[in-house]
């Protein structure tokens, strides 16, 4: 029997990396996040497992061009999310080696903020994460970004929310035109106010995905191109 396993490769920017005393402390922290992501994915009831393949913690000397070249000095230092996701996607499109090549999804975790640049050089910090729609099995579109503000629930939600964009779901209340996958059912039938993870989260439903999100992800998984997410079941 086949199992659905979404594999992740995590890279961290220098601002995030320097919060930790050691690489092992950072890796442990990220691993704990994935326990939370798995718990949220379980609410899709599609049997999706998440697996962390590895973590690369960049420091100020090793940060790649897609981070350095797009940093807005602020203060505080921040990114324009649209510019960052485009540059990151292109970078990994051109650097398909090792874990970056083998993984289903690549996420940057940043401790810097994201938002709209203002004319005075500062940034209106208003974006927790961004990801390419239905990009999971496309080598040049399998990227996402999540900001980490040290609140466990917030960052786990962001990672799960952005992952599900990559797995073919729009926000609740959005139609199929918001999904980069032909034939997607979209999520227009699930209003944002119902309060699920892909809507405006309320206390009742903020740790669950809506029925529409489930249908959208199920649709993506039914496509032949999604076969890379399926593997032989082991004692996973």
UniProtKB/Swiss-Prot annotation:
Post-translational note: Contains several disulfide bonds.
Activity regulation text: Inhibited by EDTA.
Cofactor remark: Binds 1 zinc ion per subunit.
Active-site residues from the entry: 162
Binding locations of Zn(2+): 161, 165, 171
Protein name, UniProt field: Venom metalloproteinase antarease-like TfasMP_A
GO cellular component: extracellular region
Molecular function terms from GO: metal ion binding; metalloendopeptidase activity; toxin activity
Main location: secreted
Subcellular location: Secreted
InterPro entries according to UniProt: MetalloPept_cat_dom_sf (IPR024079), Peptidase_M12B (IPR001590)
Tissue expression remark: Expressed by the venom gland.
Enzyme Commission no: 3.4.24.-
Family under the similarity heading: Belongs to the venom metalloproteinase (M12B) family.
Residue span(s) of domain Peptidase M12B: 4-232
Coiled coil regions in record: none
Pfam families assigned to the protein according to its UniProt record, in alphabetical order: Reprolysin_5
Cofactor(s) listed: Zn(2+)
Organism of provenance: Tityus fasciolatus
């Amino acid at each position: 029997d086949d199992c659905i396993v979404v594999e992740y490769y995590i890279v961290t920017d220098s601002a995030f990396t320097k919060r930790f005393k050691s690489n092992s402390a950072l890796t442990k922290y990220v691993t704990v996040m994935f326990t939370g992501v798995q718990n949220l994915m379980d609410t899709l009831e599609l049997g999706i497992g998440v697996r962390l393949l590895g973590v690369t913690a960049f420091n100020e000397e090793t940060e790649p061009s897609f981070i350095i070249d797009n940093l807005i000095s602020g203060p505080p230092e921040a990114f324009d999310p649209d510019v960052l996701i485009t540059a990151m996607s292109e970078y990994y499109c051109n650097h398909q080696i090792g874990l970056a090549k083998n993984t289903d999804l690549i996420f940057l975790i940043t401790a810097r903020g994201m938002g709209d640049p203002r004319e005075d050089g500062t940034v209106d910090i208003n974006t927790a994460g961004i990801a390419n729609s239905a990009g999971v099995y496309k080598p040049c579109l399998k990227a996402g970004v999540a900001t980490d503000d040290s609140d466990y629930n917030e960052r786990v939600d962001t990672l799960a929310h952005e992952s599900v964009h990559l797995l073919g779901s729009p926000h609740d209340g959005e139609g199929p035109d918001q999904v980069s996958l032909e034939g997607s059912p979209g999520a227009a039938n699930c209003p944002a106010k119902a309060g699920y993870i892909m809507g405006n989260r309320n206390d009742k439903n903020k740790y669950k995905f809506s029925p529409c999100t489930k249908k959208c992800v199920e649709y993506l998984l039914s496509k032949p191109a999604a076969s890379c997410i399926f593997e032989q079941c082991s004692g996973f």
